[in-house]
């Protein structure tokens, strides 16, 4: 479960239980609980992983056995079950009733609503107001929020957006009255929990004296790929009972009285989906005052929380929770094509109940974006992962080993664990080569560029030619919006940021761009590749193919130079994300193959090894380096993140300064810590709860095994007062609490001697 989505759903459930009292409008909230069944230990381990996240969000749950399941669902067979996870506060509501209650509450607070209105076009005025044209006249407004369900793609195109939202057909069956349920209800028994048979991919719940069965079957097609038919409203689609047959049989085996029940209704309707199944909630990229709340495959479950946190974002400038998991800007243009959406949305639908493994890489719509050396990496037995549409090597399988992740909670240690350890060892002891072409890259130039960037980031810009700094764009509350490595390159600045943040960071840069033309912003991500050569022998290797002086005096740490490597003119930055002597080589993309081949040819002499994202992750945790999107989010301030060294509070002006000054005076509510964990076969990954003396005091944001130091590590936020070095804590991993200790940052090379070598 995504942390963002979990927070949104939690707020919705809480809201719906109080909405009727607040508005006087009945919402038909049935607090029945939610029961997820498990037929094997693998499924139970998935639930344990989920429970860790649920704890950090505040969602109550119980892990129960077959006897407790039978009490909650007396009509279910339980003899083949291992157990279940039970959410007592969950249930179901009537979407129409919730909608009416929200409307009533909005009207009571001054909102105006209009029905039977068709939007025909939208246009923005020079003063940023929007004119929304309808079949009943124009509406001029400051802000537009697009919540158009199955019409999302058409709505987006009205304002020049290609939204990766397309409906998928979803069917469910409603039975007629079932004698046993009639008798059960007459006896005054409570309504049974919503039943989810994950291993057979369906949900079931009571509907008066009958049952509803909702399968998530394979082969469910996308609908209206080329546009919703004109005039389509609440109409239903032709049912396909044959697709549901395996699920109907499975439901009858689990609940025998369903097998003999008569079908009252068979309904097939479209549900809006995105490629990852999460909604798109937040600002639309490239537009001012235009917001999205689209792709809600969870339906009414997300309405309350999405509305709340979107309102915060619009009114206060930032949501109070981490919304990266639902931010519309998480998708690239390559992930918004017709073919990509069709393949991924259908895959996402049929995987709703499939076990969600750690490090899972699904196969649909791949490859979408590749660096020019993709074929060479494939020939080297690279095991690829996809992020933001990019194919990136996660690890390189040894000869004779299939380059694919094998998934199992039971095995705990993965099939790539040893290989990644060898990649780390090679980088730490010799030299490694990493492809980070997916990095987001921008050029910022013009007479106003320096002033513009200085007001955006909390750090100072580099003052010397070739100087490089880490700079953070903050929210008004001091949370981290974006992270950039910024280099002064001649008469311009070169900014590098996360590969998954291209659309997000371009939008962040664009929103504060002066309108007087004094600053030019250019996204050069696709024009330039990035290869990283790092390790103690990286200087020796590169010196074989460049005439540049790579010595400490000639090319100090945290600087950059325009140099020629293997005949390729490029920008070299003496920085990296693994904590070793090394250089990022930012080069013209059309010369990547030439550069790569030369490095590989020369590298043989120095024991060069290709390494992937998993090895990089291990090494960056050994350095306590924060990752944007997991360790650095809007939810925690940059001071809470322990990055005060990148904040210059004496600067005249930057976004978030006032909030940080106040927090510095009052103290931070959370502290960022590095943890060493006592584990044997499973590591933290992020979102695990952290305890002290039985009380939950924080959550992990990243975790993995540190191969260089032979320790399991995690990065985490804990309540202030729990972060002193040596503090003994516990962290829950797959349902087991493991001992953890707060250790000093950067357990590998704490004095940065390797970086400065």
Question: What kind of region is each of these model predictions?
Answer:
Residues 4-18, 49, 101, 243-246, ...:
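A non-catalytic, amphipathic alpha-helix used as a structural packing/dimerization or gating element
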Residues 3, 90-95, 199-201, 268-274, ...:
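Glycine-rich phosphate/pyrophosphate-binding beta-alpha loops
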């Amino acid at each position: 479960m995504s942390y963002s989505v979990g927070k949104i759903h939690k707020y919705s459930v809480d809201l719906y239980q109080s909405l009727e009292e607040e508005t006087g409008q009945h919402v038909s909230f049935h607090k029945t609980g939610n029961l997820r069944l498990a037929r094997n230990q693998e499924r139970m381990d998935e639930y344990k992983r989920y429970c860790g996240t649920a704890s950090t969000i505040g969602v109550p749950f119980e892990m129960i056995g077959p006897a407790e399941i039978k009490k909650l669902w007396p009509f279910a067979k339980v003899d083949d079950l291992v157990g279940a996870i039970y959410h007592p506060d969950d249930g179901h509501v009537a979407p129409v009733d919730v909608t009416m209650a929200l409307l009533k509450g909005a009207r009571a607070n001054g909102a105006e609503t209009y029905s039977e209105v068709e939007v025909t076009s939208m246009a923005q005025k020079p003063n940023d107001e929007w004119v929304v044209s309808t079949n009943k006249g124009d509406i001029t407004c400051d802000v537009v929020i697009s919540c158009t369900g199955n019409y999302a793609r058409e709505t987006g195109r009205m304002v020049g957006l290609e939204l990766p939202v397309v409906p998928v057909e979803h069917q469910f069956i409603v039975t007629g009255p079932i004698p046993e349920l009639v008798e059960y209800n007459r006896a005054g028994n409570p309504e049974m929990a919503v039943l989810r048979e994950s291993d057979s991919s369906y949900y079931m719940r009571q509907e008066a004296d009958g049952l509803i069965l909702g399968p998530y079957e394979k082969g469910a097609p996308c609908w209206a790929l080329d546009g919703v038919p004109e005039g389509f409203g609440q109409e239903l689609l032709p049912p396909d009972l044959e697709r549901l047959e395996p699920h109907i049989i499975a439901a009858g085996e689990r609940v025998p009285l369903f097998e003999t029940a008569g079908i009252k209704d068979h309904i097939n309707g479209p549900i809006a989906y995105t490629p990852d199944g999460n909604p798109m909630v937040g600002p639309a990229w490239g537009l001012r005052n235009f917001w999205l709340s689209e792709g809600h495959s969870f339906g009414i479950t997300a309405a309350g929380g999405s509305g709340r946190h979107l309102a915060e974002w619009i009114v206060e400038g930032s949501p109070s929770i981490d919304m990266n998991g639902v931010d519309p800007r998480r998708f690239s243009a390559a992930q918004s094509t017709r073919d990509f959406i069709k393949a991924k949305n259908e895959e996402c639908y049929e995987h709703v109940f499939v076990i969600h493994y750690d490090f899972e890489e699904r196969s649909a719509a791949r490859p979408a974006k590749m660096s020019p050396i993709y074929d060479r990496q494939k020939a080297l037995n690279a095991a690829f992962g996809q992020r933001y549409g990019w194919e990136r090597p996660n690890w390189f399988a040894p000869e004779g080993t299939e380059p694919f992740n094998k998934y199992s909670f039971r095995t705990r240690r993965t099939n790539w664990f040893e290989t990644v350890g060898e990649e780390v060892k090679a980088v730490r002891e010799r030299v490694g080569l990493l492809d980070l072409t997916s990095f987001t890259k921008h050029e910022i130039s013009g007479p106003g560029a320096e002033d513009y960037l200085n007001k955006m980031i909390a750090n100072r810009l580099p003052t010397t030619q070739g100087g490089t700094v880490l700079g953070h764009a903050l929210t008004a509350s001091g949370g981290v919006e974006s992270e950039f490595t910024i280099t002064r390159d001649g008469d311009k600045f070169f900014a590098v940021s996360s590969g998954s943040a291209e659309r997000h960071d371009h939008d962040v840069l664009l929103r504060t761009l002066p309108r007087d033309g004094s600053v030019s912003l250019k996204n050069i991500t696709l024009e330039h590749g990035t290869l990283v050569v790092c390790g103690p022998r990286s200087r020796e290797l590169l010196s074989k193919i460049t005439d540049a002086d790579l010595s400490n005096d000639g090319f100090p740490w945290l600087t950059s130079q325009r140099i020629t490597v293997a005949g390729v003119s490029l920008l070299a930055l003496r920085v990296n994300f693994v904590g070793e002597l090394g250089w990022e080589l930012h080069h013209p993309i059309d010369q990547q193959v030439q550069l790569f081949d030369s490095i590989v040819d020369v590298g043989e002499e120095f024991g060069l090894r290709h390494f992937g994202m998993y090895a990089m992750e291990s090494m960056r945790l050994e350095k306590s380096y924060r990752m944007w999107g997991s360790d650095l989010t809007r939810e925690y301030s940059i001071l809470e993140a322990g990055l005060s060294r990148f904040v210059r509070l004496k600067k005249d002006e930057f976004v978030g300064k006032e909030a940080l000054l106040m927090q510095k005076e009052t103290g931070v509510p959370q502290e960022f810590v590095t943890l060493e964990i006592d584990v044997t076969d499973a590591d933290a990954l992020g979102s695990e709860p952290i305890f002290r003396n039985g009380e939950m005091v924080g959550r992990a944001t990243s975790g993995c095994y540190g191969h260089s130091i032979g320790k399991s590590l995690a990065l985490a936020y804990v309540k202030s007062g729990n972060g002193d070095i040596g503090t003994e804590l516990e962290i829950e991993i797959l349902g087991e609490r493991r001992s953890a200790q707060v250790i000093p940052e950067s357990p590998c090379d704490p004095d940065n001697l390797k970086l400065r070598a």
